[in-house]
Amino acid sequence: MGYKLKRWPLVAFTFTGIGLGVVLAACSALNTSNLFPRQNRSKQLIGFTENNIIKPEAVLKAALAEDNGTETILRVNFGEALKSWYQNNKDRNIATRLTIFSENVEDEHDNLLDQKQQAEPINWPIELQKEYDQWGGSESSWKALKLYDRLIADFQSLIFSNIVANVQLTDGSDQFKPTTKDNLDSTSNKIKFVNSKPNDPNGEFFANLQAYLFAQWVVEENPLPLTQAFFAYQAPKDGLDSLYDQAAIGSALQLGYAFPAFREPNNGQSQGKTTFDPTPNSAQNFGDFIKAVFPEQKNGQTQQSNTSSRTGLFDWQTKWNTNGAANKLLVTKSNLRGAFKGVGLATAIIDQYEYLVGGSKTSSLPEVKVDSNKSNQNPLDSFFMEGKDAVAIRSIVSRAKIAMTDQTPGFKVNPAFVKVKQSQQNDTFYQNQRKLSGGQSGDNNSQGKHHYLQDAVRLTSSQAMAAASTGADSSSGTNVGGSSGGNSVLIPLPRSAALTHTQQQVQQTTSTLQTPVYARGDDGTYALAIDGGDYFLANNKRDFTKQADILLYRYLQAKSNNFKENGVEFSLNLLESGSLFQTWAQTGLTAKLYGALVAMMGSGQGTQVKGSVQGSSRAASVSVQTTQQNRQQSTDTQESEVVKLAKSLLKSSADLAKPFTDNPTFKKALTDIQSEYKDYLAAAGKLSEFKKDLGEVSGLQQAIIDRADKYIQLEKQAQKSAIGLGQPLPYQRASDGSYPALEKFFIPEDSAADGKVKASESGSAALVTLKTTDSQKSTNTVKQPDIKPTRENNDKKLKQLTSDVETKASSLITKWGATPQIGSQFSEIVSLKSKDNKPQTNMILALLSDVGIKWTKILNSFKEWFFTNTNDFKNNYDSEKKELKGNEYKDFNDLVKQTLYLRSWQRLTSKEKFGYYKELGSVKAQAAQSGMVSLSSSAAVANAVASSGMQKSGDQTLLELGKKAFESELEASSSDGQYKYLRFLSTLMWLVKDGAKNYKRLLQQAITVGTRAFVSWTVSYDDTATASAAAAKAQVAVLKTAQATNTQSDNPFNKFVQNPDYVQGSETNWFNDKSTPIKPDSLLESESTYNFTAEPFDDKTKSQKRSTGGTTNEKHFFGFNGLTINSPQSVSTASAGLTEQIFNNFGQLVTSSDKSGALSQYKDKATLKRLIQNTNSDAELNAFGEVLHRAVNVDTSNLGRFNSSGEPLISFDNKKKFLVDVVDKLDDVYFNKFEGYVGQTKVKMSDSSSSSQGTKTIRKPKPHHSPRTRVSRLWAMSFRLPTRTLTKFLLVEKLIRTVL
């Protein structure tokens, strides 16, 4: 083990400036320009030959693996199919349009030709070919694609040109009805897509297609109509600094999320007073809102209006929205994050959705009682709570040992964050804010109570809370902002609990009526409800027909200005240009149009035609079944949910498939596409949609990370008071960094055993029936939402879908049988032709090959071939395990992984991306669990896992996190991680082969004669844990130095600091992890915290044990800086503070007694004398004189002087004699090789120092001098030998381990 550890520095060395920069310069950059297959102008085919790097199959497969494959295939084939629709259309105006488009293309080509001939009279054929190359490589492909693009764009415009007029209200006989208020609310009337142009031969076809696309959008995008009431923050009448402590907070005191406030209503607001403020008062609006939405002593809640056909509608008055904010919003899964200011509002909507659909039986938000009889309400009061220590908390700022439980009520307020002024007045309006930091209104820890803060809650009336209180534990907390009545239950409640008997009678189809979610935003507080959510999310499912009905109902209400309630008005852009629906339809337009037409064409057969893309297959069979028999019903015999929804949106006599019988040529063209491409298009559609969903999940995670990082930075910068009322979001994060309770809104869980339809069979946001146990039926016990990590399952799903696409693409490529063909003599793309030599297929091949050859994956394959095609690399690289093999290299594998894992993890923008770690871990144990290496027995595996700490539930080691980061780099299709990994291994092999001769040569080049070079470790730690970061940064003295012995337990160089400089976030649980973060070391500033060498601190002890065959007491050196060279050409990245200490403070005569090591770069007196005697340059002698003057304070000023004649005062020979005499008289202590701690003064390694500045350490570098003369001793014997000559290797081992 001792020998293998010495490979670590060599691996590390390649990441230093010298190890990587110099080696790559020596190897030269890889020039891939001459590797790309292309055809030269002599028609000699040089691409895709037998001896070329890649084959056509590889390029085509790369192109087909991405969305571009679907778009290219359909661009050509669907474009050609549309020609038949235009040519054979009953509307002769449509056929005329085709003729006009064809003529336009010819005109455009003539103009292009004229432009090129005029601009390049001689080279115009070359320039013209460049244009052709972008459109398939020939004149015919250029014209065809130009026409196809025009037809597709025109077809899309025809579809949507009349969509607004086609949405109409109809009666039971499918007859038009005016959109009056009564007609809209009548249960006998339905909203349909109808043909508003009965004389148009294509009118019915367009209406059908509109209905289908709208249905597909509803199923896939899950559009949610929202009703909102917005209450903008407003500063108190005496200013924000009358509430918050301006002196403590400083310039960060700005009205907003961190420092929210509302102006007290009726305070100088009365008409006739000189202080009248015409601005609407948000607090007054909030009070009016509560009184209207939660009236006391009434059987029902008028917050929701119930028509005879629709329930759960929210009609909130426009006046409740401050500053004219809209009271109706439309969000989908694709725009949810961008629809709000702050991710907290978006997550609150997701929680509300999950709460209504019943997928988790609960919510992450507590229900809070509001008192509609209370006057002078502060809109912030609903977020404040108080409780005893028995209540779990989401923050560990107090270091209280309180475990997370399922009844977590909120975020425990840290008084260090909240600086609120105390008032001498009895201002009950602000009393809860003043409680947060203690004082007049109640101490923050009075009577054993603590104050808590919610980011979002669910508002409910006292009636609902009274109904819910039976059987619930009311001791968990108290809402300090509600009524003066009894305590309210501050835990998430099952929906069935929040009902009065009358409400249950009103709506029999659901377990409860919705209570609005109330959340804090950046600019104010928001009350939000999913309009009609109880209607279309009833019975634990999403009813697509009812969801579409609500959307269209609200759309016609807004369009006709026929609103149900007085004071309620809104607009809703549902179908017009620029709407979310049309934006979605125009993204991947060709695929959506083709998929819709194919599904419609097959609908008349009773089953959906398979192979459509962009969601038809995903949307299939998401209907919620309540019995096991129905769950098992084959999707092959079920109509697509999209088709069923589309039919419900059309007149009863409508037939989606009928228009195709009127144009059999068009139908045949679509059928031909299906016949050839259905398997690939279906697989590619699933992959595309899943990747889109993953993108939304990733975006949500990143938004939460960015939000948390903002607060972490404030803590790191000792600006806690700027955090104010900032808090974590209430949604728990899993150990892998995912937020499962939120992410299932985008990617439903694959859990058929629980009654959920698999994600591959469902619409993206559809959640379905859940099994209800007897215990759940009879109790109000709250269950914490499942926080099972999602990343691994998502990765598996992505790999599965990707593999499926690759398989289908391979079959397609085999069918094509593509081979190179000679194209234009001026073409710069490789032309391919298929076996059948069809023009459309050849056009597809040309487009795919041009795209594929530029794809990152293909580009990387060229680079990787540069390594894998060399015999030396192939013979020493295991391509299956992706690691080195062979006696000379295989022992490096663990250290290679360790190095790369840590490097990848350190490069993460957010170190919390994959969760927290508890310890360093073991490479072998980590690799054994992942199958990367084999251990001899199951016992060995168990022991390895135990030693790494991986058996602890919820804990991860640093190397486990590093492995995740490393693998994500390798697997990213848009990165060149795999190539860089091979380059790293190749560089390592080049460095260490043949006794590391290249490694030694590079070191000798870097450490020139007389150059000072050090290797060093830098760490710091705070013994008292009381210093502020700002004060610590001002300290530069070395304090309380640890003893350099193996037995010194507090040796900072052997101590693994788990969270230095807040690298894994602050002590506050800003990410709301189940496993809370560890306390940060806010004083450590080393940039190489996790770089280390596995060696004992005392080399002598290790050497003695090795020589006797004993085991070594190996320890990790943390905070490793690597090799630092004092040279203008140095490529060292060492910090300025480090170089100042080791090169300026050390190495020159500071005091008369401070001599040790001043000339250590010359090894000894004899070496320096020999260098002077062998010098033939006068300038070099003068330089030696300057070195001696600076290092030992010898007066050498006359060496460089000249007499009046311009001749040197001292001759060359006399200079040399003078310098040799000076050196000969020097004390040997000047040549001591320095090892020790360096602060403002030099101290030996075993010394300890103290300072009047206290006991806090900011920097503690331990340099180790590495003279050039030691380099030649490296690798004098093989690493594999069991014994070695100690006199040769004592210094070598130190040098080897120092180069990270």
UniProtKB/Swiss-Prot annotation:
Main location: membrane
Record field: compositional bias (Basic residues): 1257-1269
Protein's cellular compartments: Cell membrane
UniProt biased composition (Basic and acidic residues): 785-797
Region annotated Disordered, chain positions: 464-487, 620-639, 774-797, 1244-1269
Lipidation (N-palmitoyl cysteine): C27
Keyword 4Fe-4S included in the entry's annotation: no
UniProtKB keywords: Cell membrane, Lipoprotein, Membrane, Palmitate, Signal
Compositionally biased spans, kind Polar residues: 620-637, 774-783
Any one Pfam family match given in the protein's UniProt record, by short name: DUF3713
Taxonomic superkingdom: Bacteria
Membrane topology according to the record: Lipid-anchor
GO CC list: plasma membrane
Family stated for the protein in its record: Belongs to the MG307/MG309/MG338 family.
Protein's name in the database: Uncharacterized lipoprotein MG338 homolog
